[in-house]
Regions:
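Blade-loop segments of beta-propeller domains
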Residues: 50-87, 98-114
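Beta-rich catalytic cores
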Residues: 20, 63, 75, 114, ...
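Asp-box/WD-like beta-propeller blade repeats and closely related beta-sheet repeat scaffolds
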Residues: 93-137, 141-143, 159
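Conserved beta-propeller blade signature
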Residues: 32-34, 78-80, 125-127
Length: 166
């Protein structure tokens, strides 16, 4: 049995002072890590082969709580994001995002809530939890939490990525 490696960490790998860093996702094909800063409305990406100096940050005009790959699409080009009011397709090259599906049909809920966290299930469905936004204060047990699911009907195909038909 091989010995256990240990490291002494004396400083942060990335010292970027997130307001609320969440949603880490490892992109195996490019050896990169992406994660969001919900409060500061940012998506951070770092190439683990190159180190902290490769950090790229994309600034949004809304909080983003989660990201997901799109089946059959290069994640360095496009991914899904759970944003303030719905699911968006993010064009990472153009740094533009387009609303794919709103979470709610009412303006009141759209204003009060934001995406929080989510994941792709084995059937390729993108599940996203929503909760009251930061400007409302601490989360309250007020019946404002919900879970949304987005999926495309692709027969019996199973994938850990969201199927997007464009």
């Amino acid at each position: 049995m091989a010995g256990v490696k240990t490291w002494t960490v004396t400083e942060p790998y990335l010292n970027i002072h997130c307001g609320l860093g969440e949603g880490p996702y490892y992109e195996r094909d490019t050896n990169t890590l992406r994660f969001v800063d919900i409060k500061k409305k940012r998506l951070h990406t770092v190439d683990l082969s190159k180190g902290p100096e490769s950090l790229k940050t994309l600034q949004f005009d809304m909080p983003v709580g989660v990201t997901a790959d799109i089946e059959g699409v290069d994640p360095s080009k496009k991914i899904l994001i759970g944003g303030k009011s719905g699911i968006y397709v993010l064009d990472r090259v153009a740094e533009k995002w387009v609303l794919l599906k709103k979470f709610y049909d009412t303006e009141e809920k759209d204003e009060r809530l934001r995406s929080n966290d989510g994941a792709i299930d084995p059937q390729g469905r993108f599940w996203i939890g929503t909760m009251n936004d930061f400007w409302l204060g601490d989360p309250q047990a007020e019946g404002k939490w919900s879970l949304s699911c987005a999926a495309e009907n692709r027969g019996d195909t199973i994938s850990r990525r969201f199927y997007l038909c464009l």
